[in-house]
């Protein structure tokens, strides 16, 4: 699912601060514009990937409704030359698969006889479970 949200890119000494006003002023930063965009994509994907049950995800505002001045005011900050508003887009599920790929430990039960045969044949249980889940969930 690709999502697109407006973000305020504030030019600051040493880089850019990026704020998503629609998402409770979610923020990140970068040393330069390229890094700021990459960090904006990362924080947007992380925020939307597994929201808390109580977390309200506001719909994105039209770009023309997002004000640098109003957003800066929320932080008691100024708008420096070189600041701008732009859309940031990310395919949340794809980004998560490619970048949030940390392993989690799972405890499961299988029949002893099956375990004995698998151990004898040096089966990698984690690999088999991962491959079976990918197939079962029809994930590419």
Regions found by a protein language model. Give the residues of each.
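Short acidic/polar mixed-charge low-complexity motifs
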Residues: 1-3, 14, 24-26
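Short, charged, surface-exposed hinge/linker loops at domain edges
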Residues: 2-4, 45-108, 113-121, 127, ...
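Short aromatic-glycine-(Arg/Gly/Cys) micro-motifs in beta-strand/loop hairpins
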Residues: 8-22
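Short, proline-centered helix/strand-breaking motifs
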Residues: 21-24, 111
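A short, exposed loop/beta-hairpin motif centered on an aromatic-Gly-Thr core
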Residues: 24-35, 107
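Short, well-ordered alpha-helical segments
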Residues: 30-49
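Alpha-helical DNA-recognition elements
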Residues: 135
